[in-house]
Amino acid sequence: DYPSYSIPIKSNSLTFGYTLDNLLYDKLTFDISRGEKFLIVGENGIGKSTLLKLIMGELNPIEGEICVGEKTNISYYAQEHEILDLDKSILNNFSEYNLRDYELRKLLGSFLFSGDDIYKKVSVLSPGERSRVALAKISLSGANTILLDEPTNHLDPMTQMIIADTFKEFEGTLLVVSHNLDFVDNLGINRMLLLPSGRIVYYDRDIVLHYEMLNESDE
């Protein structure tokens, strides 16, 4: 009976690789509970972002399946910022939400945009500024499930904490790919999926620190 209202996302014996000779996952099984804050960690290149793309249906498994419940409405923050219209201003990227001017300015202010900054075209923004615009849109999406793929890339430490505070208050299901200890420490993570082993453990900051140090040494 999966997925159900209480289990919005479930992976059942998922096998995937870009080639049959180099599988990223072999019979990976896990489920995510409604309202849970769930973290995916592992070494660089191990398939963390790929798993989110499988959940979104952008890739197809070789065997097994990822099931998403019919009532699961997902908003997906990808590193490519595909939800942004580069030809529009920051302000006009929010036109579909029908917010009053003061409401939108308040929201953008909470993501560190103020004054005439909101009239800048997204195409001229820095990578960090684009990230902030995309995350602001995610926060407004009305989705009951949010996927965040490395949301702190290009963000300074102060901004990272602001973003963490925003998504800590999110009452839906949150699935995060990150090895940024300071950020995930402030999200209220419940459980973690360790790749490539597929182990599920309760949140352990020492494990996150291990992967943070390991991945930084590879950069």
Where do the PLM segments sit?
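ABC ATP-binding cassette signature C-motif
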Residues: 3-219
